[in-house]
Each structure stands twice: as C-alpha cells, then as structure tokens.
C-alpha cells in the first residue's frame, strides 16, 4: 500500500521556487527536479510531514503552509510557503538544488506536476 506524502513549494521574494535534483540511483523520479517533501511517518499530519521533510532535505525551516489546490493523487498533498528561514544545504537524498524563475523552469527535467503547482502558486499565492 502506498503511504501518504507531502511536498512544499518554497517561494522566495523574487517568485523563484526551490527545486532539488533527485539522484540517478533513487528509483522513482531519478534525475528529475522536484520540490522538497516525502512520506508521512506514523502519527504525523500531512503538514507536519511537509515541514519535517523540507527541513531534513534542505535545512530550511518553513512556516505558514497553505495547500496548493490542483488535482493530485489522493495520497499526495502539496503545500506552498513564502515564509522560511535558513540557507539551503541539501542532504544525501539529492544531488543539487536551484532557485528558478517561471521563465527558467521549463529548461529542467521536472517531476510530475511541478510546473502546474508553480503556476498555481504564482496565480493564487
């Protein structure tokens, strides 16, 4: 059975989003750019998991999460925030990170729904 997951679209003051590069060995989404996030642990809410995973993967502390309202798998919840502190330092689960604008993002091999989520945040967030 698939576990529930949560991800966070982190947006900076220039409307750039944070993308993380998934390594080739990781399996699903290998070599693609994606938002920070991951699976829920026992007893966690989706928001708690999103906050924890973002900090584990990037060292950023995120707050004031709001839900991205696009159709996604019912096991996935997408959040966004413009409220974060810290400096990005990626963990072992990723090979690189980048802050990208809407014009730049289409030059990247993106995980599913990344572009759709970014557009939704720019229009609604």
Name what the model sees in each region.
Residues 64-67, 115:
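Residue-level detector of family-conserved "landmark" positions at structurally sensitive sites
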Residues 57-63:
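Short secondary-structure junctions
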Residues 3, 12, 62, 69-107, ...:
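Active-site-adjacent beta-strand/loop module that shapes the phosphate/pyrophosphate-binding cleft
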Residues 115-125:
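Charged phosphate-binding loop/patch that engages nucleotide di/tri-phosphates or the phosphate backbone
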Residues 19, 66-69:
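A structural microfeature
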Residues 1-18:
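Conserved N-terminal beta-strand and adjoining loop/helix that marks the start
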Residues 16-52, 56:
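Conserved Nudix-box catalytic region and its N-terminal flanking loop in Nudix hydrolases
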């Amino acid at each position: 059975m698939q576990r529930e997951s949560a991800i966070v679209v982190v947006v900076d003051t220039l409307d750039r989003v944070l993308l993380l590069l998934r390594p080739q060995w990781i399996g699903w989404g290998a070599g693609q750019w994606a938002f920070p996030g991951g699976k829920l642990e026992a007893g966690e809410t989706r928001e708690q998991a999103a906050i924890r995973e973002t900090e584990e993967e990037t060292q950023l502390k995120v707050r004031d999460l709001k839900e991205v309202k696009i159709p996604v798998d019912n096991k996935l919840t997408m959040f966004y925030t413009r409220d974060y502190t810290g400096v990005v330092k990626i963990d072992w689960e990723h090979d690189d990170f980048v802050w990208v604008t809407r014009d730049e993002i289409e030059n990247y091999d993106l995980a599913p729904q990344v572009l759709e989520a970014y557009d939704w945040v720019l229009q609604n967030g």
